[in-house]
Amino acid sequence: KFFIAGASKRGWTAWTTAAVDNRIMGFSPVVIDVLNTVPSFQHHYKSYGAWSPAVQDYVDFDIMDWMGTKEFEKLLDIVEPYEFIKLYKQPKLVINGTIDEFFLPDSWKFYWKDLPEEKYLQYVPNGNHGLKGSYATRNIFSFYYHLINDLPIPKLEWEIADKFFEINLNPNLDYEINLWKANSSKRDF
């Protein structure tokens, strides 16, 4: 059995490998918050009113213009992790940065409800696409440790509705909860 993790394009590879290799017992895709690619990138463009400078290479090669074409749809059928979403039955820890230059901090809404349990989502405060420091890796190591030692992972259920964030916790477990929030209605944080 294997645990896999990777950041950015290697995170995409973690998603696709977990879909097809039954030896994967858990995985952690990092800073690749683009499952369900088309609505995610449409949201990206609509939110900014343009493409982020981080994706300029893709714009320069007209890749963004491929969206909506038959060829692009055929490509997504093969390489888009969201196409395989029902296969992700392993425990997974998705880690993203709140100021990722490529992906918006609310891109989870295009796939999270469809992703099978057991699933965990972490956003690193002030974390860019490189997630500088050890914050993310410590959590991956802890997640992996719990999996290989068959230890329970604290489970919480959360929901965002009407601008409120609701969390339901198991009262029999100890928790430490830290809140990080940005109050700006602008998308330039």
Residue ranges and their predicted role:
Residues 2-8:
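Alpha/beta-hydrolase fold nucleophile elbow
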Residues 16-65, 122-125, 130-138:
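Hydrolase active-site cap/lid region
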Residues 34, 68-84:
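Active-site nucleophile elbow and catalytic-triad environment of alpha/beta-hydrolase enzymes
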Residues 88, 94-96, 100:
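Short beta-strand/loop motif that positions the catalytic acidic residue
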Residues 90, 104-112:
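Short alpha-helix in the alpha/beta-hydrolase fold that links the catalytic acid
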Residues 101-107, 131-132:
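Conserved alpha/beta-hydrolase "acid-adjacent" motif
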Residues 135, 142-181:
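Surface beta-strand/loop "capping" patches
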